[in-house]
Amino acid sequence: MEVLDRRDDEIRDSGNMDSIKSHYVTDSVSEERRSRELKDGDHPLRYKFSIWYTRRTPGVRNQSYEDNIKKMVEFSTVEGFWACYCHLARSSLLPSPTDLHFFKDGIRPLWEDGANCNGGKWIIRFSKVVSARFWEDLLLALVGDQLDDADNICGAVLSVRFNEDIISVWNRNASDHQAVMGLRDSIKRHLKLPHAYVMEYKPHDASLRDNSSYRNTWLRG
C-alpha cells in the first residue's frame, strides 16, 4: 500500500536495510499471533488499535467516503505499535488529500459509527514543517494512555491537505461540555502546544449537516 511503500523508500534511501527486512504487521494479523506476542514477553496496551488510510482522487466528485477507507493494520502491544509505526510514511511524503486514522479497534473512522455519532472532534491546524512531530507525540500519548478520560476518546486523524496538515482527536460525547474542555486541556498539555495555536471543536452531527469535517466549527479555545 502506498502509505507503507513510501516509508520503505525513505528507509531504503537512508541505508537502514534492517528495518526493511523486519516483518510487516498487516491487517491479516491473527489472534494466534497476538497471543504468541504476549507469551513472548511483549507489553500489552490498555486498548487495541487499528490504523486506517483514506486517499481520495482530486477532482473526482461523488466518491464514497466509506468505500475509500482501507484498514491497514491492527495491534495490541507496544512492540506491535512500533512495528507498524516505523513503516508508516511521514506526513511530508503523503499526497494531498490523504487521511490517516488511528482508532480504537472496533470503531470505524466514520461520523455515523455508533461510538462516534454523538461525539465530535478537536481540530488543530499545523504547517507541514511541524505536523509530523505533533502527530507522533499525539500517537504516543494515545498508545501510552496519557490523555485524560481515555475511555471517552475514540481515535485521532491526520489529514494531509495542500497547504496545511490537520490533526483531530475524536471523542464520544459532544454534549458533555466539561469532558470536551477537559480533553482540550489534556491535548494542549501533552503536545506542549504553543499559545499561538487555536483549537477548534466540531460535533459530528454538524459535520453530517454541512458535509464538512473542518469548516464551520462552533467552539474555539
From Swiss-Prot:
Residues making up the signal peptide according to the UniProt record: none
Family annotation (Pfam families): IF4E (PF01652)
SUPFAM superfamilies with a match to the protein in the record: eIF4e-like
Keyword Transmembrane helix: no
Domain of life of the source: Eukaryota
GO CC terms, sorted: cytoplasm
GO MF terms held by the record: RNA binding; translation initiation factor activity
Annotated PROSITE patterns: IF4E
Quaternary structure, from the entry: EIF4F is a multi-subunit complex, the composition of which varies with external and internal environmental conditions. It is composed of at least EIF4A, EIF4E and EIF4G. EIF4E is also known to interact with other partners. In higher plants two isoforms of EIF4F have been identified, named isoform EIF4F and isoform EIF(iso)4F. Isoform EIF4F has subunits p220 and p26, whereas isoform EIF(iso)4F has subunits p82 and p28.
Family: Belongs to the eukaryotic initiation factor 4E family.
Function: Recognizes and binds the 7-methylguanosine-containing mRNA cap during an early step in the initiation of protein synthesis and facilitates ribosome binding by inducing the unwinding of the mRNAs secondary structures.
Protein name as it appears in the record: Eukaryotic translation initiation factor NCBP
Organism from which the protein derives: Arabidopsis thaliana
Phylogenetic lineage: Eukaryota, Viridiplantae, Streptophyta, Embryophyta, Tracheophyta
